[in-house]
Design a protein with these regions (language model features):
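Membrane-interfacial terminal anchoring regions of lipid-handling membrane enzymes
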Residues: 1-422
Length: 422
């Protein structure tokens, strides 16, 4: 499915008026309320169209593990000229100032069935049916031929539908909400990763199934569960943290922000920042969020995976990496292919080039470990689409960590990172 957004993601009527071919309305639908919303919307859009036959509807919960197989069976006998139109219902928060209150009723971006009914009764403007750019089954079947590791047409069509509607969602929610999809499957099906496992199998004399199971474990450990709600909570946390010692307004150069926006829209972008304070990353997160720039996946040591705060960071894109893994070839292979995945799909990445806080308030020599992994990914990336490394400098009037720096310079013991800092 072409993931380019249609001119108007609400005007399904206009799309159907322009086509007289067979149409298949493929809806991502989790609840009865969503099914009712979509059906009412479809009935309104179908009146007076030039469609010769009433479009076929397929309603699936696309997050269900059986959805792809079910879809494949329903697509099997349909002709190539069938136009597949992906649909879904988008739920919007009541507003930034109420988000934390909304959380008491569940995730405002993905509410449960009961909350959906309340929204439809009291705030129907928070419910927005959308559709994404359609494609014919013939086009999808031809594209599937170039994807030998995808199981079947149902799996391929479902993936393309999810990615297409996610792109349209960002036009409504904001570009700050850019979430990966199908990461585990894409890593495990990657030809180079499969070659890595075959090589490791020969070296370790391990059973293939055992290596795949080990890889799945590391994927779950590394890959964050990014959600819009997680990002909203992280930004609230970020503002709380940095406003304890600084003004809420962060001074930035608007021209540089627009330059970064253009780069992030067209290319993979790596943000390398200095790291003099615990506040650094929180200030960067807030600045990107306020300017509707995609939130970066951030690399951090697994020792920073604190209770509560670590969970919020993980749900917003933090990647916690083990401190030592040179003797773990499966972990290394998973990490490399995950970085490949993020770069090839233009997800911004962020980390400190110094590897950690400087401990003195001054810049220290860089550490090149992650940069090495990045360059490996860049070698496999499309050479016609350059990868950009963007240096970020966070400058403070006074660094709040200075007392800890002075104590350490006088011979004091460095305190481990923990929640007490906050």
């Amino acid at each position: 499915m072409n993931t380019a957004s249609p001119p108007d993601f609400h005007d399904l009527h206009g799309l159907l008026q322009q086509t007289a071919q067979r149409a298949l309305l493929l809806a991502d639908c989790r609840t009865g309320s969503e099914a009712e919303v979509l059906e009412r919307w479809l009935q309104g859009n179908l009146r007076g169209t030039a469609v010769e036959n009433v479009p076929q509807r397929i309603l699936l919960d696309m997050s269900d593990s059986t959805a792809a197989d079910s879809l494949d069976r329903q697509l099997a006998d349909l002709p190539d000229d069938t136009l597949v139109i992906p649909l879904r219902v988008l739920w919007l928060p009541a507003g930034e100032q109420r988000r934390l209150r909304d959380v008491l009723l569940g995730n405002p971006h993905n509410p449960g069935s009961l909350v959906q009914k309340l929204i439809l009764n009291f705030s129907p403007d928070r419910c927005s049916p959308i559709y994404a750019e359609p494609a014919t089954l013939g086009t999808l079947r031809a594209a599937l031929a170039d994807q030998p590791h995808v199981r079947h047409l149902g799996d391929f069509t479902l993936r393309r539908a999810v990615l297409a509607t996610k792109k349209v969602e960002r036009r409504l929610r904001g570009h700050r909400y850019k979430e990966p999809a199908f990461v585990e499957d894409d890593i495990l099906q990657d030809p180079e990763f499969r070659a890595d496992l075959e090589r490791i199998q020969g070296e370790k004399k391990s059973a293939p199934a055992d290596l795949v199971a080990e890889a799945r474990k590391y994927i779950k450990e590394l890959v964050p569960t990014s959600t819009p709600l997680g990002l909203d909570l992280l930004i609230r946390l970020s503002r709380y943290v940095y406003t304890r010692g600084y003004d809420q307004e962060i001074m930035v150069d608007p021209k540089q922000v627009e330059k970064l926006r253009k780069l992030a829209r067209e290319h993979p972008v790596i943000l390398l920042c200095n790291h003099r304070s615990q506040v650094d990353s929180f200030a960067i997160y807030s600045t990107l969020y306020d300017n509707d720039l995609p939130h970066p996946h951030t690399f951090g040591g697994i020792n920073m995976k604190w209770p509560i705060i670590g969970n919020i960071q993980r749900s917003s894109g933090m990647i916690f990496i083990r401190r030592a893994f040179n003797d773990n070839p499966v972990y290394k292979a998973v990490l490399q292919r995950y970085i490949d995945y993020l770069v090839s799909r233009r997800f911004p990445l962020l980390w400190s080039i110094e590897g950690g806080r400087s401990r003195t308030g001054k810049l220290v020599p860089p550490r090149y470990g992650l940069l090495h992994w990045l360059l490996n990914a860049a070698e496999r990336y499309d050479k016609t689409q350059p990868l950009y490394i963007v240096p970020l400098s966070v400058v403070f009037e006074q660094v709040v960590d200075v007392d800890a720096y002075a104590l350490e310079q006088l011979g004091g013991v460095k305190k481990p990172e923990n929640l007490a800092w906050f």
